[in-house]
Amino acid sequence: MLEAMREKPPLVHCITNYVAMNIAANVLLASGASPAMVHAPEEAGEFAGIASALTVNIGTLSTQWLDGMRAAAKAAASSGKPWVLDPVAHYATAFRRQAVADLLALKPTIIRGNASEIIALAGGESRGQGVDSRDPVEQAEDSARRLAERQQAIVAVTGAVDFVTDGNRAVRIKGGSVLMPQVTALGCALTCLVGAFAATAPEDLFGATVAALATFAVAGEDAALGAAGPGSFAWRFLDALAALDGEALDARARVSIA
């Protein structure tokens, strides 16, 4: 799937936050996809119809950005394009809770979040603080299954060991590095990469989500080998993504049935 993406780079419409734009765009470029950071409500809907996939991240939310998100999500849904929701800290304020409720009504095909975000999104009590998760991934697995069934979507919970489910099937993905949470917006960039893989294999969104997370995990392991800390890890991670090929990914991905 990684090689297929590079042979035919998908145009990925990324509505993400200010903090994430640079790293998200570079992650897509290093992986072989084509990013577009378009969020104005005057054009977001039209652009979503042009792109191969849409990703929506509510990290730095505003009324204007939310209008763009709704317009893009409506366009993606009506045209059958995959779209990914990243409900960053949706539990933190009433504005965020309502925004995510509105976006969930537009039926995202994939939802990616940390454990605290997924637990809360499924109706549970999470220990999240701001954008940071205080819950381990394993405690979010049942919540992810329920959310996937309720939304008829793929749900990915990312953390030390990632978890992906469609409500019936479920897998865990191991790998990555302890340095990854120390680089801001890597999770947001992962959401965009999930969109790129979904655009490449819209007929297999479960497999596309797993492939994106496995790509991040393997690249994270490679980047950590020579990194002295989060600063050198960040640029090494982009190099590792660019150097990774499909054969190495297939050989090294640590995916197990959950």
From Swiss-Prot:
It comes from the Bacteria. One of its GO terms (biological process) is thiamine diphosphate biosynthetic process. CDD domains: THZ_kinase (cd01170). The keyword Nucleus does not apply. It catalyses: 5-(2-hydroxyethyl)-4-methylthiazole + ATP = 4-methyl-5-(2-phosphooxyethyl)-thiazole + ADP + H(+). Substrate binds at residues 37, 185. Its cofactor is Mg(2+). Pathway: Cofactor biosynthesis; thiamine diphosphate biosynthesis; 4-methyl-5-(2-phosphoethyl)-thiazole from 5-(2-hydroxyethyl)-4-methylthiazole: step 1/1. One of its GO terms (molecular function) is magnesium ion binding. Gene3D superfamilies: 3.40.1190.20. The keyword Magnesium applies. Pfam families: HK. It is an enzyme of class 2 (transferase). SUPFAM superfamilies: Ribokinase-like. Keywords: ATP-binding, Kinase, Magnesium, Metal-binding, Nucleotide-binding, Plasmid, Thiamine biosynthesis, Transferase. Its EC number is 2.7.1.50. ATP binds at residues 112, 158. Catalyzes the phosphorylation of the hydroxyl group of 4-methyl-5-beta-hydroxyethylthiazole (THZ). Belongs to the Thz kinase family. This is Hydroxyethylthiazole kinase. It comes from Rhizobium etli (strain CIAT 652). The gene is thiM.
